[in-house]
Each structure stands twice: as structure tokens, then as C-alpha cells.
Amino acid sequence: MVVIRLARGGAKKRPFYQIVVTDSRNARDGRFIERIGFFNPTAQGQAEKLRLDADRFAHWVSQGAQPSERVASLAAQAKKAATAA
């Protein structure tokens, strides 16, 4: 099954997540099909916290990809921010 989930990067105690489309059998930080955004939970000040390519997200969901709970909430947050801006 194709899923949309977070792949962890960054340093110890300083997480940085890529939002990736991957096969559910692949490792969390392993091989992926496409990178569609990022999430930086430790962003401060003017640093960008979340970027998500909404068109690609919608495309993959229409193809049957299942977003994780966290990615679904981040997508809703990104959509809300896009309509406010």
C-alpha cells in the first residue's frame, strides 16, 4: 500500500521531517517515491515550519495513497494557512 508519512532527519534532539510518499513496507527513513514537503517542529522566529505541495498531496490521495494521522493533520494545517494568506 502507498502511504504518505514523515521521514525523520536532522540531528539528535533536533528533528526535521520530510513528508514523503512511499510503500508501507519500506523503512521509515528508507526508500521513497516522492518528497512532497517538509515539517520543522523546532522552527523559531521567521523560519518556515511547514511546506507541503498541495497539488501533489491531492494527486497521491486521489491515486489511493493513505496519509498518516500526523500528515493528515499537517495537510489540514497547511490548507488553513494557505487560505488565510
Curated annotation (Swiss-Prot):
Signal peptide: none
Family matches, as Gene3D superfamilies: 3.30.1320.10
Keyword Ribonucleoprotein (UniProt): yes
HAMAP family: Ribosomal_bS16 (MF_00385)
The name this protein goes by in its record: Small ribosomal subunit protein bS16
Keywords for this protein: Ribonucleoprotein, Ribosomal protein
Membrane in keyword set: no
Family: Belongs to the bacterial ribosomal protein bS16 family.
A single BP term in Gene Ontology: translation
GO molecular function per UniProt: structural constituent of ribosome
Pfam families: Ribosomal_S16 (PF00886)
Origin species: Acinetobacter baylyi (strain ATCC 33305 / BD413 / ADP1)
GO cellular component entries: cytoplasm; small ribosomal subunit
